[in-house]
Every structure is written in C-alpha cells, then in structure tokens.
Amino acid sequence: DMEKLAVKIRPGADAQGKNPVEEVRRYNRELKKIRSFIRSRPVKNDFEILFLENFEKMYRTADDILARMETSGCRKLFEESVSKGSVVHGDYNYHNLIMLRDDIAVTDFEHMHTDIQIKDFCYFLRKAMEKNQWKQKILEAYEEVRPLSEREKEFAALSLAYPGKFKKIAGSYYRSNKAHLSEKNVEKLQICIRQTEEKYEFLSRIFPLNL
C-alpha cells in the first residue's frame, strides 16, 4: 500500500518530483510550441486539422488550470509532501499490479520518489478510466481507505482536469516523422477529444471545477 509507506528517500537525482505549478506551466508552453509549428505548415494533414480545431478549447482549460494552481494550495502541498518524505510509486498502473488470491502485489519501483501521494491515484484513475469510463465509485472506494484532505481533492481535480492526453498525443506527433502519418494517430486524437468531454462530466459531479 503506497499510501501507508513510511519510507524516507535519500536526496539525489530523480528522487524528488516536480512542482506541479511549474510542470503545468511547462506543459502549456509545449502546447503553444506545437500549435505554432502546425500553423506554419503550408499543407495540413488530418491530424493537424483536428488538432487546430480543438486547440483553443483545450488550451483555455490548460491555462485556466494553471491560473487556479497558482492561487491554490498545490504548491504548498507539494513542498510539504517533499519535506515530510511522502513517497509515490511513480508509475502506478495496472501493468505494475499483480492480483494475488487475497491481496495485490505492486512491482517496478524504479520511478519511486518523494511527491504528492495522491499523484499515484490520479495516474491510476486516468489510465483505468480511459478504458473503463469515468465512474465515481473508484474515488469513493479510495476514500474509504484513505480520506483526502481538501487540498488533496483540489489538486486531484486540477490534475485530472488538465488535458494531458491531448498534449501527450500532440507531442508524440510533433516528434514523429510527419511524412508518414498513421491513421492510428488521428484515431487516438479523436478518442482523446471524446473522452475529454466524458472526463469533465465525471469531474463536474464530484469537484466544483466549472470547466
């Protein structure tokens, strides 16, 4: 149970997570950089057209989340988590879980570091819900084991609301060979856009985000 570990990690390279406010600020810069690149292309393919059609809405959300993070308790929560040595797995998803008869084993701890512990849950929830729809029961089950503070709920809401999948797919395309566009890339972006609406509907039911 990562949430109950009382392990202190020795300071060193990659032993500490990133400040979430600065991380989102960097993500937003990357999104604008990708848009500038795509805009500059004289002939745009299907992926680029779809990206530009949805960029403004996605970026407004990303920018709004950054503004809220800057005035929220996220920065303080991060500093306190690092100071007290709160541990996260760093790659907590179903690939690293082994179902036993009466328990669950967690594997692959090479990304473990100090950070906001709720990040593990946010990462797992995002991965699981993208494949199984967004359902409130998983959050309720988590809080039965480990109730969240108001600051943690605020961070979880903002973290989950950020259009990270949109940025990830766009970034992957930006770094790829543009001469060989795969239909799979377009399909991934289409699914991401559809799931983003489902995600916001889910979040609006449990967090006062008003996105």
Model regions: which residues?
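Internal "kinase-insert"/substrate-recognition segments embedded within catalytic cores
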Residues: 1-11
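ATP/Mg2+ or Mg2+-diphosphate-binding catalytic cores
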Residues: 167-211
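Short, internal acidic amphipathic alpha-helical interface segments
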Residues: 9-12, 144-146
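Active-site activation/catalytic loop segments of kinase-like enzymes and analogous catalytic loops
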Residues: 114-149, 160-181
